[in-house]
Amino acid sequence: MQEFTGVWVRDPRIQKEDFWHAFMDYEVCIHTNSLAFTKKSSCVRRRFSEFVWLRKKLQENALLITHIPKLPPKNPFFSLNNAKEIGARMEGLRKFLEAVVHSAVLLSDSCLHLFLQSQLSLKKIEACAEGRTRYTVSEAIHSFSSGHKRFDSLCEENMEEEQCVQCESE
């Protein structure tokens, strides 16, 4: 059987932080039969700044071994209401992830797997990848994966203390 990994970036949503500040996040889904992934299907929500963080992490971890694909350009005048701009950004993010998941060197990065298959915050992804949590990468993916909204810090701390068997935030 031939190995495949499909990546989708879809369902853009405006998230309001407060009256003056809002951002767009996207549903990032993968479907694969690759043994490199813990789960065969998953969906998480990520925002553009998190993709920027991921690219930087991949660059740091891969050093000069491989070329890191480019992200779509950051537009300071990006409109949350312009369907054409949003569509172009989603396509650019999809192409970035497609290139990343088809690179053997980048596919070995724990941050990538946690980014794609868990709803952990960037801070928690970093801590888990560096072995500074009580849970492994695989455990994090199973516990903090699709079907769950982002866990608040209290729930994440409970899991670290092995008290959070099935935390679902509403």
From Swiss-Prot:
One of its GO terms (molecular function) is phosphatidylinositol phosphate binding. A 1,2-diacyl-sn-glycero-3-phospho-(1D-myo-inositol-3-phosphate) binds at R47, K74, R89. One of its GO terms (cellular component) is endosome membrane. GO terms for biological process: cilium assembly; intracellular protein transport; vesicle organization. It is a peripheral membrane protein. Keywords: Cytoplasm, Endosome, Lipid-binding, Membrane, Protein transport, Transport. Residues 4-122 form the PX domain. CDD domains: PX_SNX10 (cd06898). It is found in: Cytoplasm; Endosome membrane. The keyword DNA repair does not apply. Belongs to the sorting nexin family. Probable phosphoinositide-binding protein involved in protein sorting and membrane trafficking in endosomes. The PX domain mediates interaction with membranes enriched in phosphatidylinositol 3-phosphate. This is Sorting nexin-10B. It comes from Danio rerio.
